[in-house]
Curated annotation (Swiss-Prot):
Pathway: Metabolic intermediate biosynthesis; acetyl-CoA biosynthesis; acetyl-CoA from acetate: step 1/2. Mg(2+). Can also accept Mn(2+). It comes from Borrelia duttonii (strain Ly). This is Acetate kinase. Belongs to the acetokinase family. Keywords: ATP-binding, Cytoplasm, Kinase, Magnesium, Metal-binding, Nucleotide-binding, Transferase. Homodimer. Its EC number is 2.7.2.1. Substrate binds at residue 96. It comes from the Bacteria. Coiled coil: none annotated. It is found in: Cytoplasm. It catalyses: acetate + ATP = acetyl phosphate + ADP. Mg(2+) binds at residues 10, 393.
Length: 408
């Protein structure tokens, strides 16, 4: 198969991100990219970049994702944009799916059986999967000749051993109800592992890594022999590191206790842990680390504390994953928005590890602030490489989609 046009879709609860690519093996060109925001309102916005131009449409009445897709098609094919001439030019559609459960170990071409399986596990990601399924079903109607592919944030972690993914709860919970650690950010970790192999000139199967995906949502991944070995997020993205609005690890008895004290339902407490905790909860000001740093540098107590708690949790996870990998690693990699731009967080996260030979070059680290550039910030005296690599989850989806549809 030669050059083909592939549409990448990332469905949010009230948004639809998209990128249209012309792709040939290991060579891609972006034809258009954009987002439809504030879906389910009369103030919806479409932003799209194409051919060095930018188009923004505001105050649109887009009451559903179904209507958002129709607006997207209209935008891609209208005479003003001329991005594509007709819909059948799009031969593949790649979807980012948050949760694939234990069923989906790799990206798959979507058929009715796949849709049925996705519906069975919708309860594992109730805010994301059901909407993504509706979008897929609608796209079968709108793009009858295109192959659709599901790419899962959880698939990468399906190589974890039971000792890593099982909770110490009754085994029947796992057997009967599939309660276990699944992990997320897998599309990011897959890309970073592949990129690191190229940078270090090593075979992927020879790589042992610790990767930190630090954004508003944050997690850490231990990679052994090029495969996911353990990760900080769990059944849901709430477990693990301190994030923008998520608490990360807590004692589970906090939930019924605060439910009783605050006279709120457990669902409401869960919502607080997901949307009002983390950096926002501790700082009492913002989930944006840039705002928190401004307050912290002015000696504001809660903002300083938020940074300390966040980086302390990161250090604990790095230390535990070093031990889990028998202290045999090739590199520590920082990625995502905070990981690629915040040199202070990187420095604090690795503070103390110089005693076991993991050493940052502070000058290199301070200069590593361009989110689109790869950096080696390790000291010449470091036993391992410390890298900053921007992630590209879309490229993982694009390549998986191409690989699956090229011969079909």
């Amino acid at each position: 198969m030669k050059n083909i046009i592939i549409l990448i879709i990332n469905t949010g609860s009230s948004s639809l991100k998209f990128t249209l690519y012309e792709y040939q093996y290991q060579s891609e060109q972006i034809l258009a990219s954009g987002i439809i925001e504030k879906i389910k309102t009369t103030q919806a916005i479409i932003k799209i970049k194409f051919k060095n131009k930018f188009l923004e449409l505001t105050n649109l009445n887009i009451k559903s994702h179904k209507k958002a897709l129709k607006h997207l098609i209209k935008t891609l094919t209208n005479k003003k944009t001329k991005i594509i001439n007709y819909l059948d030019q799009i031969q593949g559609i790649g979807h980012r799916i948050v949760h694939g459960g234990a069923k989906f170990k790799n990206s798959v071409i979507i058929n009715q059986n796949v849709l049925n399986e996705l519906k069975k596990i919708s309860h594992l990601a109730p805010l994301h999967n059901p909407i993504a399924i509706k979008v897929i079903e609608e796209m079968f109607i709108l793009f009858p000749n295109a192959k659709q592919v599901a790419c899962f944030d959880t698939s990468w972690h399906q190589t974890m051993n039971q000792k890593a993914f099982l909770y110490a709860t009754p085994y029947s919970w796992y057997k009967d109800y599939h309660i276990r650690k699944y992990g997320f950010h897998g599309l990011s970790y897959a890309y970073i592992t592949k990129r690191t192999a190229i940078i270090l000139n090593k075979n992927i199967e020879d790589l042992n890594l610790i990767i930190l995906h630090l954004g508003n949502g944050a997690s850490i991944n231990a990679v052994q022999k090029g495969r996911s070995y353990d990760t900080s997020m769990g059944l849901t993205p709430l477990e693990g590191l301190v994030m923008g609005t998520r608490s990360g690890d807590i004692d589970p008895t906090i939930i019924p206790l605060m439910s009783k004290i605050l006279k709120k339902t457990t669902k409401q407490i869960e919502n607080i842990l997901n949307k009002e905790s983390g950096m926002l909860g501790i700082s009492c000001k913002s989930n944006d680390l840039r705002d928190i740093w401004i307050e912290s540098n002015n000696n504001e107590y809660n903002s300083k504390l938020a940074v300390e708690i966040m980086t302390y949790r990161i250090k604990k996870y790095i230390g535990s994953y070093l031990a889990a990998l028998d202290f045999n690693i090739d590199a520590i990699i920082f990625t995502a928005g905070i990981g690629t731009s915040d040199y202070e967080i990187r420095k604090l996260s690795l503070q103390g590890f110089e005693k076991i030979g993991i050493k940052i070059d502070f000058q290199k680290n301070n200069l590593a602030i361009d989110k689109n550039t790869e950096y080696d910030i390790s000291s010449n005296q470091s036993n391992i490489k410390i890298l900053v690599i921007p992630t590209n989850e879309e490229l993982t989806i694009l390549e998986d989609t191409y690989d699956l549809i090229k011969d079909n």
